[in-house]
Amino acid sequence: MNAPTPAPSPVDVIPAPVGLLAELTHRCPLRCPYCSNPLELDRRSAELDTQTWLRVLTEAAGLGVLHVHLSGGEPTARPDIVEITAKCAELGLYSNLITSGVGGALAKLDALYDVGLDHVQLSVQGVDAANAEKIGGLKNAQPQKMQFAARVTELGLPLTLNSVIHRGNIHEVPGFIDLAVKLGAKRLEVAHTQYYGWAYVNRAALMPDKSQVDESIRIVEAARERLKGQLVIDLVVPDYYAKYPKACAGGWGRKLMNVTPQGKVLPCHAAETIPGLEFWYVTDHALGEIWTKSPAFAAYRGTSWMKEPCRSCDRREKDWGGCRCQALALTGDAANTDPACSLSPLHAKMRDLAKEEAAETPPDYIYRSIGTNVQNPLSEKAPL
């Protein structure tokens, strides 16, 4: 009698995706210097049409996706945003609108509510209007955001404020907390900048020093106790000052997928920075086929790709080796240990780099823009 075939390791089983990040467009009225979009932004002419997005959502629901994050760019720049949101409701997908709250966002909010929008995440660049508008690169943005937030809570929609923290606004962390309470937000994300995409280009302008980071953490922890039951505060610390890396996107190809405006499906925001990966498009393949068979998703899924010290580490199924894109940017090899990990031989150098940049006078922001040839000031610097 043949021996039974052993069951595959739980690590090797491909789980159903939980979330879909639908980047409907890269168009955005803001020009934030930490934007996680790629440096080469998709133009409007390359964007997926309405029917393709509706098919993608239908396939996502069939795969078991629960949450759809309608993002961009600015998702309300799409004339079909109401139709797309209605499709989420029809399919039973929880819809989260990730928005700047400016431009045409307010004008479309009531219609989005009427078709079943579930949640709004509003980005706020600063508490002081002048500082916020300097960071976002758009004048008169702050009053629009406040009007938008007020209408969200008037409609009874749950509101999350997202504040990306860096040296230009880290002094405003107490103000972000007060603002979230004032606006009636249910949740506040105090998310220290993650240095990918445009943030990597602007790292020297954005990097705070460790004492500032530590103080911001202390403030958040105190506020969590003070506001328990009133406001949930999520805290994301910067990798450059962390002891262990984050599980990027919950683990490469384990929980989330990201569909770009032109239909390229990514395991994470910055995956396109890794050379040699083969990405599939929703115009050529069904979403389920991409999730289970795409070479890009298979490349760093699970643990078999890992080198030491990750391969034998007891945290390998907790943080999944950290961020592949950051490992590439800082070590030159996407399969190396993320240097955010204290077990990486390059961890101390990463800390030193942050310390050096935080001590320097910050350069001017290089603002996010479509159609501009961006010269990355870090491109000529050797990895760690």
UniProtKB/Swiss-Prot annotation:
It catalyses: [PQQ precursor protein] + S-adenosyl-L-methionine = E-Y cross-linked-[PQQ precursor protein] + 5'-deoxyadenosine + L-methionine + H(+). Transmembrane segments: none annotated. Residues 14-230 form the Radical SAM core domain. PROSITE patterns: MOAA_NIFB_PQQE, RADICAL_SAM. InterPro entries: 4Fe4S-binding_SPASM_dom, Aldolase_TIM, MoaA_NifB_PqqE_Fe-S-bd_CS, PQQ_synth_PqqE_bac, PqqE-like, Radical_SAM_PqqE_MftC-like, rSAM. GO terms for biological process: pyrroloquinoline quinone biosynthetic process. Coiled coil: none annotated. Pathway: Cofactor biosynthesis; pyrroloquinoline quinone biosynthesis. Keywords: 4Fe-4S, Iron, Iron-sulfur, Metal-binding, Oxidoreductase, PQQ biosynthesis, S-adenosyl-L-methionine. The keyword Cell division does not apply. The keyword Metal-binding applies. Its EC number is 1.21.98.4. [4Fe-4S] cluster binds at residues 28, 32, 35. One of its GO terms (molecular function) is oxidoreductase activity. Its cofactor is [4Fe-4S] cluster. It holds the Pfam family Radical_SAM. Binds 1 [4Fe-4S] cluster. The cluster is coordinated with 3 cysteines and an exchangeable S-adenosyl-L-methionine. It comes from the Bacteria. Catalyzes the cross-linking of a glutamate residue and a tyrosine residue in the PqqA protein as part of the biosynthesis of pyrroloquinoline quinone (PQQ). Interacts with PqqD. The interaction is necessary for activity of PqqE. Belongs to the radical SAM superfamily. PqqE family. NCBIfam families: PQQ_syn_pqqE (TIGR02109), rSAM_more_4Fe4S (TIGR04085). This is PqqA peptide cyclase. It comes from Methylorubrum extorquens (strain ATCC 14718 / DSM 1338 / JCM 2805 / NCIMB 9133 / AM1) (Methylobacterium extorquens).
